[in-house]
A protein has these predicted regions:
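Noncatalytic, beta-rich nucleic-acid-contacting surfaces in large DNA/RNA-processing enzymes
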Residues: 1-445
Length: 445
């Protein structure tokens, strides 16, 4: 699949998700991230204790993604390849409005309903009912009470179907032997969701379209055509001072992962000097870990302020100045301190992120016992466990961060060394957005 893409002028991303931590994937050319160089853990991708199926997600340039899917259909047969159905459900606000409309509520009442349901992800009608204003609306009259009861019964039911944005199933036998199928816009479509398809052993691969890969490819083609220069993105230097000057100045409009005002502000304060700085920024600038950005920047500029809970944590946290950023660091700490295998450490990481109290208590004792067997005192063992528990909820997969930071660096390199081609392609991709077009033109000047 990757070989076809690379030999048919379809740009492929350097890697995505935990699969970039696989040395086999790197050696086969599936990814272009060296897991030994970047200290990535294979066990984050696959380990003996993992009970769920691993998968390799692949980024293709968005303008040629369909070409790869067509290749798969031709190679394996149209009855062996399908997309995956997804179901939209009647969530609180949608079901409340739909039922109200059917019961003859006027537009004013429907708008009132929308305003009375709090804007909270995943909120239920029962939760909304706890709010005094909503409860008063429900009991305003008998019709409203009937509306509420009907809405609660319908809440959560499937509302409509659509197609999974990236998932493709490939099977060695015709899929109609395994799953109910229907016809989608571009071929077969399972009538089972991704979870149900995986449960019976069907292989799912995510074929994702990434606009930034299309931009990179177009720049490379145009530079070759106009200047007769072959840009080998696998051979560019990762210590280019001009690139880091660009990043330090916050001139990252149009750069993958780095173009928002917030990230640009962080880059200016951080003054990145190494590729690792880019990896850290792309991992930290998310809800949750953002609160650690000031600490990270302060310690980056003041190494004497870096502190570790225990000296044994220094080799693991040195590159991030004592701040836990990556999921792999949590696994390394569990291995170093408690003697966990990397498979056991991944189970611990998953338990922490899901916050299952029963499993967490079991894993806590497992960790403390292992740490004590390794010569750590009970108090420091508990402190280290609490430390990784704090960060586990939003630790970022380092393999993914390195992969996407590579795309960001490549775009920064092209912007510095081939600015005319960079701006021309970016402007072509923001047609229709006056704000983005104006920002790009201002920066280009």
């Amino acid at each position: 699949l990757i070989h076809f893409a690379k030999t048919h002028e379809v740009m492929v991303g350097p890697g995505r998700g935990s699969s970039a931590g696989s040395l086999v994937s790197y050696l086969l050319g599936i990814t272009t991230i060296d897991p030994l160089k970047y200290n990535l853990l294979f066990e984050r991708f696959l380990n003996p204790e993992r009970v769920t199926m691993p998968d390799i997600d692949i980024d293709f340039e968005d303008t040629r993604r369909e070409k790869v899917i067509k290749y798969v259909q031709d190679k394996y047969g149209e009855h062996h390849v399908s997309g995956i159905v997804t179901f939209g459900h009647l969530l609180a606000r949608a079901v409340a409005r739909d039922v109200g409309r059917i019961m003859g509520f006027d537009e004013t009442s429907l708008n009132e309903i929308s305003k009375l349901i709090p804007h909270k992800l995943g909120i239920t009608l029962e939760e909304a009912y706890q709010k005094p204003e909503f409860k008063a609306f429900v009991h305003r009259n008998h019709r409203n009470e009937r509306w509420f009861e009907v809405s609660k019964k319908l809440e959560g039911l499937p509302r409509h179907t659509s197609t999974h944005a990236a998932g493709i199933i490939i099977n060695d036998q015709p899929l109609f032997k395994f799953a109910p199928l229907t016809t989608g816009d571009t071929g077969l479509l399972t009538q089972w969701t991704m979870t149900e398809a995986e449960r019976i052993g069907l292989l799912k691969i995510d074929f994702l379209g990434l606009r930034n890969l299309s931009i990179i490819h177009q720049i490379i083609l145009q530079v070759k055509k106009d200047l007769n220069i072959n840009i080998d993105i696998e051979a560019i230097p990762y210590d280019d001072k001009k690139v880091f000057d660009l990043l330090s100045n916050g001139d990252t409009t149009g750069i993958f992962q780095l173009e928002s005002d917030g990230v640009r502000s962080v880059l200016k304060r951080l003054q990145p000097e190494h590729f690792e700085d880019i990896v850290a920024v792309t991992s930290l600038y998310r809800p949750g870990p953002m609160e650690e950005i000031p600490t990270y920047i302060t310690r980056r500029h003041n190494p004497n302020q870096v502190a570790y809970l225990h000296p044994d944590l220094e080799p693991i946290l040195k590159n991030t100045y004592g701040v836990i950023i990556y999921q792999e660091q949590i696994m390394l700490i569990a291995s170093q301190v408690a003697g966990f295998s990397y498979g056991e450490a991944d189970i611990l990481r998953r338990a922490m992120s899901k916050k299952n109290r029963a499993i967490l208590e079991s894993e806590r004792q497992h960790f403390i016992d292992g740490a004590k067997n390794n010569g750590y005192g009970e108090q420091i063992s508990k402190q280290i466990f609490d430390l990784i528990l704090k960060f586990a909820d939003y630790g970022f997969p380092r393999a993914h961060a390195v992969s996407y930071s590579k795309i960001a660096y490549i775009m920064s390199y092209l912007k510095v060394h081939y600015p005319h081609y960079f701006y021309a392609n970016i402007l072509s991709n923001v047609i229709g957005s006056e704000k983005k077009t104006a920002a790009m033109i201002d920066e280009a000047k």
